[in-house]
UniProtKB/Swiss-Prot annotation:
It comes from Agrobacterium fabrum (strain C58 / ATCC 33970) (Agrobacterium tumefaciens (strain C58)). The lineage of its organism: Bacteria, Pseudomonadati, Pseudomonadota, Alphaproteobacteria, Hyphomicrobiales. It catalyses: a lipid A disaccharide + ATP = a lipid IVA + ADP + H(+). InterPro entries: LpxK, P-loop_NTPase. Pathway: Glycolipid biosynthesis; lipid IV(A) biosynthesis; lipid IV(A) from (3R)-3-hydroxytetradecanoyl-[acyl-carrier-protein] and UDP-N-acetyl-alpha-D-glucosamine: step 6/6. This is Tetraacyldisaccharide 4'-kinase. The keyword NAD does not apply. Keywords: ATP-binding, Kinase, Lipid A biosynthesis, Lipid biosynthesis, Lipid metabolism, Nucleotide-binding, Transferase. One of its GO terms (biological process) is lipid A biosynthetic process. Belongs to the LpxK family.
Length: 348
């Protein structure tokens, strides 16, 4: 997977996208065939996958957390399954938010582990069975829609309404992970995030295919005494511009900004530069929760940077307060039907 999306992916298709179109065509054939023909294993609990059409962030992790909170409110014990992207561990691991570090397990699993049981595994089936062993009765996959090795009881695809699907081309000419027709066929529902219009064509396609469309917004938790502050905003996420818009919406005056690749592990020099620039201009440092978990327990002056940074926490808030419950209930019904079919086949 591409770690840093080139800017032309998110612009109107130009010469770069067309030059790479033969490779995109080949990539699309392979990705589409893999989605259609992949053998998928069953587990005895409902599986919800939170995915997106494109490379990069669209709000999958906060969506997964919102679904988990709704499950807990229903008396369920949800668990998260993540690949652990950005981490070095290649064995199935139960994540401990207090002891593990982002360099080992990835940043998103640490955010998830604050909410519920979280397992990272490059082998999804093995990871799912580990969650079942931990007593989980609802598995929520953060990403993995295009490469699922598990039978999914609900595939919720998240799309950012400002970025949409970028130039609409498949990797490497654009950000799209697999042919849209196949992705649309396999998704259960669509979640549009924000108030932009870049996702409107896909929303219409989903509605035409009788797929439910949910609406949500990322709501930041407003820090105390933040409005009007002069800040240095820094972020190592898929879409730093989205974070900067959030900071401005909260009333922060961004004097300086520093963008880094998604899942970026800060070097000592980068940390020193951020601290120096903030002090020189008398600015409040501000960053994302994902960046904060990468700094926690990191080397050198990372702890100093974290201590001096205002961390903006976010929540995914559905327009319909029953939306998350609807996703969960549908997954439970689909799981029951799946298990009944499996039992019927095994008894014949």
């Amino acid at each position: 997977m591409v770690s840093e999306a080139p800017p032309f992916w998110w612009q109107k298709a130009g010469w770069q996208a067309w030059l790479l179109s033969p490779f995109s065509l080949l990539y699309g054939k392979v990705a589409g065939r893999r989605m259609r023909t992949a053998k998928r294993a069953n587990v005895p609990v409902p599986v919800i996958c939170i995915g997106n059409f494109t490379v990069g962030g669209a709000g999958k992790t906060p969506t997964a957390i919102a679904i988990a909170r709704a499950a807990v409110a229903r008396g369920m014990k949800p668990g998260f399954l993540s690949r652990g992207y950005g981490g070095t561990l290649d064995v199935t691991t139960l994540v401990d938010a207090q002891h593990h570090r982002a360099a080992a397990v990835g940043d998103e699993p640490l955010l998830l582990a604050r909410e519920a049981v979280t397992v990272i595994s490059r082998r999804r089936v093995e990871g799912a069975h580990r969650l079942v062993k931990e007593g989980v009765n609802l598995i929520i996959m953060d990403d993995g829609f295009q490469s699922a090795r598990l039978t999914l009881d609900y595939a919720l695809v998240v799309i950012d309404t400002v970025r949409g699907i970028g130039n609409g081309h498949l990797v490497p000419g654009g950000p799209v992970r697999a042919p849209l027709a196949e992705q649309m066929r396999q998704m259960t529902g669509l979640l549009k995030v924000g108030k932009g219009h870049a996702a409107d064509p896909l929303v219409r396609q989903a509605a035409k295919a009788a797929k439910p469309v949910f609406v949500a917004a990322i709501m930041p938790q407003e820090p105390e005494d933040f409005r009007g502050k002069r800040v240095l905003a820094f972020a190592g996420i898929a879409d730093p511009a989205k974070f900067y818009r959030t900071v401005e919406a909260l009333g922060g005056d961004i004097v300086l900004s520093r963008s880094f690749p998604d899942h970026h592990h800060f070097s000592d020099d980068e940390i020193d530069d951020l601290l120096k620039d903030a002090r020189k201009e008398n600015l409040q440092l501000v960053t994302t929760a994902k960046d904060a978990v990468r700094l926690n327990g990191h080397h050198g002056r990372a702890e100093e940077l974290l201590w001096n940074s205002q961390v903006i926490e976010i929540d995914m808030v559905f327009d319909d307060p029953n939306a998350a419950g609807t996703v969960i209930e549908t997954a439970v019904v689909n799981c029951r039907a799946r298990l009944l079919r499996d039992n019927a086949r095994s008894s014949t």
